[in-house]
Amino acid sequence: MLDAYGLGVSTVNLNVKGDEIWRYGSFTHPEASVRRKAVDAMKEAMDRAAQLECPIVTCALLNDGVDYPFEINYMDAFSHALEGIREAAEYRKDVKISLEYKQSEPRVHCLLNNAGKMAYFAQMTEQENVGVTLDFGHALQALEVPADSASFLGQTGKLFYVHVNDNFRNWDWDMVPGTVNLWDYIEFALALKQVGYEGWITADVFPQRHDPIRIMEKTFEWMDYIFDVAEKIDEGKLKQMQKELDTFEIMDYIRSLL
């Protein structure tokens, strides 16, 4: 079917949160047998990705975390996750593992929950094929500035994949990108350009009660518009205004491009 329609596969996603076995975690589960199943599942996903000529497996360790104090030993959990992801990454170097962070849900507190911690984790694996998926909505939920997160991850060389959506910073609503945080999105698009990001940008949106096809159409329309505005920005002019510390001159300039 892919060949018939001239399509490629952006990523293979490994879900280690939906099945009952992952209720109390996957790569950080206290039982070694469950952790082994998580590692084996990652290796299988990497094999499937290679078969599809797809360079990346994405995974969000969202059941790896806690709901209550004293529920886990954090040092053990972090070490288990490192060991498991490192083993999977060493299994085949031709496929990247891109790990997605999130502050909470389904766990009250996810173990890998912000850009800095996720980048550090990726570095600690000591594997070049381990990196980070930056979900714009998750960055908002973690009270990050998405452009800052993109710039930071881009500079570390660990920005492997991007999800676009939007929310009010109170929950991961997966709304059409730019409909709530337009300023942040324009700055985010500029940051991706500045770090030279050339990977996939995936629409991670949820239709709620609206027509799914229209939601996807609007996602593409809004993202095209956002990147068009970002492309209009004279980076030399912007940098000079930033040196002069005139915030409202900057905002007026960006507003003139809308």
What spans do the regions from the language model cover?
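Transmembrane beta-strand segments of Gram-negative outer membrane beta-barrel proteins
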Residues: 6-8, 206
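Active-site-proximal loop/turn and secondary-structure-junction residues that shape catalytic pockets
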Residues: 13-18, 61-65, 101-105, 136-140, ...
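Histidine-acidic metal/acid-base catalytic patches
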Residues: 86, 93, 112-134, 140-258
